[in-house]
Amino acid sequence: MATLSLLSTGVGAAITNRTPSASLTFITGSRTTNKRVSFNGGSARSGSLHCSFLAPSSSLSSNFSGLSLGLDLTSNTGVSTDRCRRFVVRAGKAALCLTKRSRSRKSLARTHGFRLRMSTTSGRALLKRRRAKGRKILCTKTNPSSGKRASP
């Protein structure tokens, strides 16, 4: 069974020469592994250390599948502080530059129409469910260019 026994972060011994470091000790069954990582002036890109450890399948227990550590070393001496930029999705108002918000029936029919529903297995299953429910209109977004609903 793999366990994390020691996790420490520290700085160098000299006050003038401060180097961020991390020390990890892993105990896997009968073996103990010590790992020590330190950052020098330009060797690292960010101020955070990301370690991940996955135990081998021979010592893998059912209740331990892996360990992922993210250490944020606050000392920024000689280390650039690039932040991870994440894409944030927000539900908000429509942009001011968009004047036409509605789409034409033809473009809606291309993505939600009867012919598209019939071309896929899940679409045919959807049509089958709507028929069983008794819906008169199977696909509401179909472009009525021909048939009963066509305008003269």
From Swiss-Prot:
Gene Ontology molecular function: rRNA binding; structural constituent of ribosome
Name of this protein: Large ribosomal subunit protein bL34c
Lineage: Eukaryota, Viridiplantae, Streptophyta, Embryophyta, Tracheophyta
Single GO BP term: translation
Function according to Swiss-Prot or TrEMBL: Component of the chloroplast ribosome (chloro-ribosome), a dedicated translation machinery responsible for the synthesis of chloroplast genome-encoded proteins, including proteins of the transcription and translation machinery and components of the photosynthetic apparatus.
InterPro entries named among the record's database cross-references: Ribosomal_bL34
Transit peptide: 1-91
Domain of life of the source: Eukaryota
Principal location listed in the UniProt entry: plastid
Family, as annotated: Belongs to the bacterial ribosomal protein bL34 family.
Entry keyword annotation includes Membrane: no
Keywords carried by this UniProt record: Chloroplast, Plastid, Ribonucleoprotein, Ribosomal protein, RNA-binding, rRNA-binding, Transit peptide
UniProt source species: Spinacia oleracea
Classification via Pfam families: Ribosomal_L34
Compartments where found: Plastid, Chloroplast
Quaternary structure and interacting proteins, as annotated: Component of the chloroplast large ribosomal subunit (LSU). Mature 70S chloroplast ribosomes of higher plants consist of a small (30S) and a large (50S) subunit. The 30S small subunit contains 1 molecule of ribosomal RNA (16S rRNA) and 24 different proteins. The 50S large subunit contains 3 rRNA molecules (23S, 5S and 4.5S rRNA) and 33 different proteins.
A single GO cellular-component term on record: mitochondrial large ribosomal subunit
